[in-house]
Amino acid sequence: EPTATVYESGDKVPEIVKEIKAMGQKAFELMEAEDEKQIVNLELLRETVKTFVYKTRQNELTLTITGIFEVARRYKNIEVGIKNWQKTEDSWIVSAYAKNLRDNLYNEAIVEQKFRTPIGQGGSLVLDSFSFQKAQSKAKRNAIRQVIPANYFQSMIKLFLKNYGGKK
């Protein structure tokens, strides 16, 4: 069973977070941008988002953040929450957990979200007033991914494509 580490203000970001960011940075940024838009729509504006699936540049179908939350809701018996958060000089670091009570699985995820986000082609940085909400949602998303069986995710992708058409 995973153990939790609480990071105090001033601690370095865990190496795994740095490694994840280093792998496929562009694909990661595209996925993050898509998820950030949905976080704002879903959690802050309370809009209904029908797009649960999208196709990556590698031509693979994957779930959006909305799709992951919907899969957790339909799977049932998934408890999700925020364990810890801290504000650093330039970002939020949020730790979330997910418990699959049916299968007795537990996972934690840590996400770092910068206060400033690039805008447009020039990449000038502007203050992101939703950075804390984004960090929470991304941490929950990452925790949920590990406690629901992969075959269930795949069957839900097929169902979402059939019912909602998905985003290509």
Can you name each region flagged by the protein language model?
Residues 1-168:
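Polyanion-binding surfaces on beta-sheet-dominated domains and ring/shell assemblies
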